Amino acid sequence: MMKTVEEQMAVIQRGAEEILVEKELIEKLKKGKPLKIKAGFDPTAPDLHLGHTVLINKLRQFQDLGHEILFLIGDFTAMIGDPTGKSATRPPLSEEDVLKNAETYKEQVFKILDPAKTKVVFNSEWMSKLSAADMIKLAGTTTVARMLERNDFGERYQSNTPIAIHEFLYPLVQGYDSVALDSDIELGGTDQKFNLLMGRTLQQHYGKEAQCTLTMPILEGLDGVQKMSKSLNNYIGIKDAPNDMFGKVMSVSDELMWRYFELLSFESLETIAGYKDAVANGENPRNIKIKLALELIERFHDKESAEAALKDFETRFSKNAIPDEMPEFTFNEVMPLANLLKEAGLVSSTSDGHRMVKQGAVKLNGEKVTDSRAPVENCEQQVYQVGKRKFARITVAA
């Protein structure tokens, strides 16, 4: 038996940024029938991170309320390239890459969604059947002026940055997906609002009942400033090793921890409020953060892995111990320390290496080093550490 409309709305509203139009959503729920809930993901990279799961978690909530989940893999749109938030044309992917990435998506999302209650669809199923005439008719449903209302398009137009015609097609294709699927609600990030509303417009144009839209916040990365992104290296990947996932969660600020609880945890709001009260009354935020780390690792791995990661964390970080196992490297040439750190994968670039040394975040056998340009000559099995979580055993035989 489905929950009351009021009970469902309480779940739906949790963490949501905006619901359009809320009155229409309530009327849809009053019908007492499972609604079609759509969310699209372009398989532009093989691995998902926790930022992606904000939407997937909301899909799971709808699923638990008894609604039908349409997990749309945008294999067709991925070959266009989503221009949302981009200051330049985004290169499209090959069909081979798209299909390969799509397979990994299915494997990863079912760590959250119930596969038996999830319908996975590919928008190439209907988009590849449209003729040139059909695409021209679709393009005729909107205007260039409407497209330029989108912030990114408008800014690029004002700055004389080229906008390719195929980029205008992206929101139209995403909107047409809603027509093809007869979706009742579409979910997306706040940066997708224009595209979601295009779905409403096109459904009305084709004589269908307009979908409601629900936007979720963009999750900040580990730095607490920019959106979580693999390219910014401020992400926690779904496929990260348990120990890495644990360490990354523990590295977030105490303030950001509550944001992660709200958007990533399946704990009730009452439970989270209890955690906040505990911290306000003197509980160490670290203890609460551990609960979040354990929950996420258990979700994406298993309980045993979560417990092992906690034990490793306590050994490695709480006691400032150097782990027994770490990557080992042998180099046959003398190079400056910053370059060595980059070659060993301890930093993302030599400039990052210089910066980390300057910040006092680099240690050699437990002792801080201060000269990032000092040449590293013949040495054997020296332990280098960057930050709290990165270690490597390095030999230089020049």
Curated annotation (Swiss-Prot):
GO molecular function annotation: ATP binding; RNA binding; tyrosine-tRNA ligase activity
Residues given in the record as ATP binding sites: K230
Domain of life: Bacteria
Domain S4 RNA-binding: 335-396
Keywords per UniProt: Aminoacyl-tRNA synthetase, ATP-binding, Cytoplasm, Ligase, Nucleotide-binding, Protein biosynthesis, RNA-binding
Top-rank EC class of the record's enzyme: ligase
InterPro entries: aa-tRNA-synth_I_CS, aa-tRNA-synth_Ic, Rossmann-like_a/b/a_fold, S4_RNA-bd, S4_RNA-bd_sf, Tyr-tRNA-ligase, Tyr-tRNA-ligase_bac-type, Tyr-tRNA-ligase_bac_2
Any one annotated GO CC term: cytosol
SUPFAM superfamilies in the cross-refs: Alpha-L RNA-binding motif, Nucleotidylyl transferase
Coiled coil: none
Placement of sequence motif 'HIGH' region: 43-52
Entries under SMART domains matching the protein: S4
Pfam family, one: tRNA-synt_1b
Protein name stated in the entry: Tyrosine--tRNA ligase
Source species: Hydrogenovibrio crunogenus (strain DSM 25203 / XCL-2) (Thiomicrospira crunogena)
